[in-house]
A protein has these predicted regions:
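Structured catalytic-domain cores with a bias toward divalent-metal coordination
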Residues: 1-87
């Protein structure tokens, strides 16, 4: 088991990469949705990454949605918690 400190990132790109890698290791289906109206401070794309575990939502009896980063700054903490759940 990884140490919890390894779940957290110092910036958006690192948080995104860690989340996507953890989702892939967990066997999740991944999708990314680019925000056409916003950019990172360095000009890079801002995206919402979606990791789905289990059956497609239209075939699942119950669905749990967990999100972070809706307002920006809390994304690093939320992403770390999500990575911990995936690990």
């Amino acid at each position: 088991m990884e140490q919890p400190e390894s779940w957290f990132a110092a910036d958006y790109a690192e948080a995104r990469a860690k989340f996507r890698a953890a989702a892939e290791r967990a066997g999740a289906a991944l999708a990314a949705y680019r925000n056409p109206d916003a950019r990172q401070p360095d000009g890079g794309d801002l995206t919402t990454d979606v990791a789905r575990l289990g059956p497609a939502p239209d075939r699942a009896a119950k669905v749990l949605i967990v999100s972070s980063g809706t307002h920006g700054v809390e994304g690093f903490c939320g992403s770390g918690c999500q990575i911990g759940m995936l690990e």
